[in-house]
């Protein structure tokens, strides 16, 4: 008889990421810094930047994915892609821009960790840790110049 591996992601790490996001989200110094990235969209919180980069709220309650920004409106795909492109350019040298991109990608990273985790000895917790680390490196080094569309999908490959 075979046992099914745990189907959970690293909850403590997700909780730390969530606490970090809550601290950064409305901090005036962080928002001033973000306005220097030339995103071309107005915002009063980093949640609004994530929404402008194409994040779509509406994930099922209790799914373990971050809640969508309150009151944020969905951007057309081309506009969202351009915001994400500019964030990726800023993320090469700015950790906060990289953190915004990571927040945009977290639901996809969590979903992939859950899928991969059932096949791993360490479960989805280990898969999430590894994917998060790899995602950060990809965000910081993504070759924006070689791609013109679908940045979020390319980042999650």
Locate each region found by the language model.
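Sigma70-family region 2
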Residues: 90-93, 112-120, 132-151
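Structural recognition of an alpha-helix C-terminal capping motif at a helix-to-coil junction
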Residues: 104, 126-134, 149-157
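Extreme N-terminal regulatory/targeting segments of RNA polymerase sigma factors
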Residues: 1-121
């Amino acid at each position: 008889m075979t046992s099914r591996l745990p189907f959970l992601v690293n909850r403590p790490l997700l909780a730390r990421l969530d606490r970090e996001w809550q601290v950064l989200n409305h901090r005036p110094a962080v928002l001033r810094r973000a306005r220097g990235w030339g995103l071309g969209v107005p915002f009063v919180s980093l949640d609004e930047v994530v929404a402008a980069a194409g994040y779509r709220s509406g994930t099922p309650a209790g799914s373990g994915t971050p809640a969508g920004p309150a009151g944020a409106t969905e951007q057309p795909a081309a506009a969202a892609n351009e915001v994400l492109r500019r964030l990726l350019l800023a993320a090469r040298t700015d950790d906060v821009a990289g953190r915004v991109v990571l927040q945009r990608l977290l639901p996809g990273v969590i979903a992939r960790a859950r899928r991969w985790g059932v096949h791993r000895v360490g479960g989805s917790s280990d898969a999430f840790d590894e994917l998060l680390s790899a995602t950060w490196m990809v965000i910081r080094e993504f070759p924006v110049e070689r791609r013109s569309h679908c940045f979020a999908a390319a980042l999650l490959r």
